[in-house]
UniProtKB/Swiss-Prot annotation:
Substrate-specific adapter of a BCR (BTB-CUL3-RBX1) E3 ubiquitin ligase complex. The BCR(KLHL7) complex acts by mediating ubiquitination and subsequent degradation of substrate proteins. Probably mediates 'Lys-48'-linked ubiquitination. One of its GO terms (cellular component) is nucleoplasm. Keywords: Cytoplasm, Disease variant, Kelch repeat, Nucleus, Repeat, Retinitis pigmentosa, Ubl conjugation pathway. One of its GO terms (molecular function) is ubiquitin-like ligase-substrate adaptor activity. Changing A153T: In RP42; impairs interaction with CUL3 and ubiquitin ligase activity of the BCR(KLHL7) complex. This is Kelch-like protein 7. The gene is KLHL7. Pathway: Protein modification; protein ubiquitination. Its main location: nucleus.
């Protein structure tokens, strides 16, 4: 009984599906017949007059497809009784396509007809076509057309399309303001745009540049709007150097007392203490940050050799470096500042050199309580952590210290489980991971494969799965829940192998080896790419940069870009958002 019941139930479901498919076929067939009747002008009861073109149709079909025609034909409007209905300000080809859609549910939307179709679909209230046009335009938004699409969406009451266009404008403002569309905007739209907190910029000087570009495009006619436009620039957020060298020298500013007052107000802001600055609200709200990640390399043993590497265009940019020579030091980046710690000349260096990438300025702070070289460092939540190292030729240390960037004070934390120097250390998801290294810098110092993790919340260390290969002087980077150990050396020589630690699984796995063996590897990761920018092979240095794609497990040797010439350099990823363009020029 039960089995037959199941069979009957299954049979009913199958019959329903077949009936639904058959119904769809029948409906398509009916509409196909009606469309043929329309083309043959059979039983048509209305003619749409569009300019000089006559388009026959059936009222019931138009009324079903369009709320506009539904109201026209079912109310007491004059057109409800007219055989010919004139559609003013309409394009014949577009109306033909909409009528065709009413019968077939098919329409071709492309870059040539989308604006006209959207306008007509909006006017005649044909929602499916309107949605198709909106979806098409959302996919086409770019820097050259986003402003026009935003205006169109506003005029045609398409909030979803406007939101997409506006979000693109704000996200890509630094590209948008350099287009012809931006220069041709009216003063109301420019003023509104420059006032947005959500403009994504590297620094406020880009907003200033946008304002000046717009004013100069038609200077005689836009002169009366100068104060209103420049009032939207947040001068206190512009660097003091840019204000004095570029803004103050601009003829537009010099010739206008009101604009000069804005610049002076911005310069005064830089003279205030941090406490007094916090009390100011007007003109100091930050914009949305446009992250600009670069890799900074500092000469170490050759301090005059300091550069940025830009992974977007593979360019090198010099950094002004006045600090002294350091051997086997470490560097980290936090909140616009690069901290250079440890290292030695004849003796360990006690001072910590600091470089502000936004202000392009150097200054010094008190370094780690225990001066040493061959240490490792990383940053997390406003704190700089240093681990291990050695005190000039001595055995490796268990030491673990922390510098609080807010209070500018050093604190000794619980020691590592294993003494180590020439190791790697990275922050990942709020935890501090330490991998590899050796027991000392002398020949007898055993190379390690051990790993451990520190939890700042509990101030405890936990031993982890060891690396497959013991290594020191290797690169160590964190990419998407994986920690990659790149090259380095074991007790026998240089390594080309690469392995990663899966944080979730607590295990190491080998991946594709480097196309080069590195006794010392200097690498950093931006996005999913690991860049090896410097290194030493034992008999020579790395000639050209190497790239490793962590998603495809592929290495590329870039023969067009020379590697950094100093193999004992320091390396870290920095965010130059906020830095003046002149500072970053190649």
């Amino acid at each position: 009984m039960a089995a037959s019941g199941v069979e009957k139930s299954s049979k009913k479901k199958t019959e329903k599906k077949l009936a639904a498919r058959e119904e769809a076929k029948l409906l398509a067939g009916f509409m196909g017949v009606m469309n043929n009747m329309r083309k043959q002008k059979t039983l048509c009861d209305v003619i749409l007059m569009v300019q000089e073109r006559k388009i026959p149709a059936h009222r019931v079909v138009l009324a079903a497809a369009s709320h506009f025609f539904n109201l026209m034909f079912t109310t007491n409007m004059l057109e409800s009784k007219s055989f010919e209905v004139e559609l003013k300000d309409a394009e014949p080809d577009i109306i033909e396509q909409l009528v065709e859609f009413a019968y077939t549910a098919r329409i071709s939307v492309n870059s040539n007809n989308v604006q006209s179709l959207l306008d007509a679909a909006n006017q005649y209230q044909i929602e499916p076509v309107k949605k198709m046009c909106v979806d098409f335009l959302k996919e086409q938004v770019d820097a050259s057309n986003c402003l026009g699409i935003s205006v169109l969406a506003e005029c045609l009451d398409c909030p979803e399309l406007k939101a997409t266009a506006d979000d693109f404008i704000h996200q890509h403002f630094t590209e948008v303001y350099k287009t012809d569309e931006f220069l041709q905007l009216d003063v109301k739209r420019v003023t509104h745009l420059l006032n947005q907190d959500t403009l994504t910029v590297r620094a406020e000087d880009q907003v200033y540049d946008a304002a000046v570009r717009w004013l100069k495009y038609d200077e005689p006619n836009r002169q009366p709007f100068m104060v209103d436009i420049l009032a939207k620039v947040r001068f206190p957020l512009i660097s003091k150097n840019f204000l004095s060298k570029t803004v103050q020298a601009e003829p537009l500013i010099q010739d206008n007392p009101e604009c000069l007052k804005m610049v002076i107000s911005g310069m005064r802001y830089h003279l205030l203490s941090p406490e007094d600055r916090e009390e100011l609200v007007d003109g100091t709200r930050p914009r949305r940050k446009k992250h600009d990640y670069r890799i900074a390399l500092f000469g170490g043993s050759q301090p005059q050799s300091c550069r940025y590497f830009n992974p977007k265009d593979y360019s090198w940019t010099d950094i002004r470096c006045p600090f002294e020579k350091r051997r086997d030091a470490a560097c980290v980046f936090w909140d616009n500042v690069v901290y250079i710690l440890g290292g030695s000349q004849l003796f360990p260096i006690k001072r910590m050199d600091c470089y502000n990438v936004v202000k392009d300025s150097w200054y010094s702070k008190l370094g780690p309580p225990t001066p040493r070289d061959s240490l490792a460092a990383c940053a997390a939540e406003g704190k700089i952590y240093t681990s291990g190292g050695s005190e000039v030729g001595n055995s490796a240390l268990y030491l673990f210290e922390c510098y609080d960037t807010r209070t500018e004070s050093w604190h000794t934390k619980p020691s590592m489980l294993t003494q180590r120097c020439s190791h790697g250390m990275v922050e990942a998801n709020g935890l501090i991971y330490v991998c590899g290294g050796s027991l000392g810098n002398n020949v007898s110092g055993r190379v390690l494969n051990s790993c451990e993790v520190y939890d700042p919340a509990t101030e405890t260390w936990t031993e982890l799965c060891p690396m497959i290969e013991a290594r020191k002087n290797h690169g160590l980077v964190f990419v998407k829940d994986k920690i990659f150990a790149v090259g380095g050396q074991n007790g026998l020589g240089g390594l080309d192998n690469v392995e990663y630690y899966d944080i979730k699984l607590n295990e190491w796995k080998m991946v594709s080896p480097m196309p080069w063996k590195g006794v010392t590897v200097k690498c950093a990761a931006v996005g999913s790419i690991v860049y090896v920018l410097a290194g030493f092979q034992g008999v020579g240095r790395l000639g050209h940069i190497l790239e490793y794609n962590t998603e495809t497990d592929k290495w590329v040797a870039n023969s067009k870009v020379r590697a950094f010439p100093v193999t004992s350099c320091l390396i870290c990823v920095v965010d130059t958002c906020g830095a003046n363009e002149e500072t970053l020029e190649t």
